[in-house]
Every structure is written in structure tokens, then in C-alpha cells.
């Protein structure tokens, strides 16, 4: 996965990574050989990253701390951090934001069993305390259908169902 937020991504800072592949063979690859793209990398689900060398930008300690506090507050204000979730449920589609499309379809607060489209941020599916994997799967499918029916865009889940 090429995780990212607030204008930065792992592809921007990864110099190299060491990992175990599915055959438990230790491998190493340079950052530019990891096939990073939007929310994707060449790592397979069975690969385990053991370590990574990251190249970060130097900065003034207090400025970095202030930026961290700013981003933490921004997340608290806009994301449902008070409930369990798997984070962002859908990848950003071309031409818009999944959360805006879900909200536009009137799905904030929509529930299937114990799974709910967050009322705080429509891009998150939260667990109200008793959600099953089936609840989450059905909710994701319902959201995809509703958004597709309204916009013609099929949202791609960011959550990997195992």
C-alpha cells in the first residue's frame, strides 16, 4: 500500500525496504522499484515489511511539533476517531471525493447491522460495537450501488476483506 495523507505519500520518502515474501525469503528493494502508485505498491498481501529506510525533510523541532498538533486536531475535527473503523473505506475516484459522493447519495448514518457510514465523515465505515464482517461487506456493497446509481461511478474499496 502507498499510504498517504495531507499531500504526502510513502512513495515520496521510501529509499529502500526489506521484507519477507510469501515464501519467507528475505528480500530488499529500492524505493523506486516498489511500484508505488495511488494506494498501491508491488507488495503482495502475504509480504511482511521488516524495515524501511525513509528520507525525511529536516525541519525545526517546534515547527514540526506544531504541524503534528495541527494535523491531529484536523483529524479529530473531521474524522470519527471515537469509534472503531478501518479508516477510509473507498479510494478517491477520478473527478471527485468518495466521501462527497456518499454524502450526496444521502448515506451518512446509513447502517447495516452494527456497521454504519460515519455521520461525521461519509468516507468512513464505523463499527458501532457489534458489526460483523458480513455487515461491513453488505454496507460497502450498498454504498457502491447507491453511488453508482446516482453518479455512474463505481467506488473502489480501500478496505481489503480477508
PLM regions with names:
Residues 1-15, 85:
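A gly/ser-rich beta-alpha-beta helix-loop segment of oxidoreductase catalytic cores
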Residues 20-21, 26-138, 142-162:
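Phosphate/pyrophosphate- and phosphate-bearing ligand-binding catalytic cores of soluble enzymes
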Amino acid at each position: 500500500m502507498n499510504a498517504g495523507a495531507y499531500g504526502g505519500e510513502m512513495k515520496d520518502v521510501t529509499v529502500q525496504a526489506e521484507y519477507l515474501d510469501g515464501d519467507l525469503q528475505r528480500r530488499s528493494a529500492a524505493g523506486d522499484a516498489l511500484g508505488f502508485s495511488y494506494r498501491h505498491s508491488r507488495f503482495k498481501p502475504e509480504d511482511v515489511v521488516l524495515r524501511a529506510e525513509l528520507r525525511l525533510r529536516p525541519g525545526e523541532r517546534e515547527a514540526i511539533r506544531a504541524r503534528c498538533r495541527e494535523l491531529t486536531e484536523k483529524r479529530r475535527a473531521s474524522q470519527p476517531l471515537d469509534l472503531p473503523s478501518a479508516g477510509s473505506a473507498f479510494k478517491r475516484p477520478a473527478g471527485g471525493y468518495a466521501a462527497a459522493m456518499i454524502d450526496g447519495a444521502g448515506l451518512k448514518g446509513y447502517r447495516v447491522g452494527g456497521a454504519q457510514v460515519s455521520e461525521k465523515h461519509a468516507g468512513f465505515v464505523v463499527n458501532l460495537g457489534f458489526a460483523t464482517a458480513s455487515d461491513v461487506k453488505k454496507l460497502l456493497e450498498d454504498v457502491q450501488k447507491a453511488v453508482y446509481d446516482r453518479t455512474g461511478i463505481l467506488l473502489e474499496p480501500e478496505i481489503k476483506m480477508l
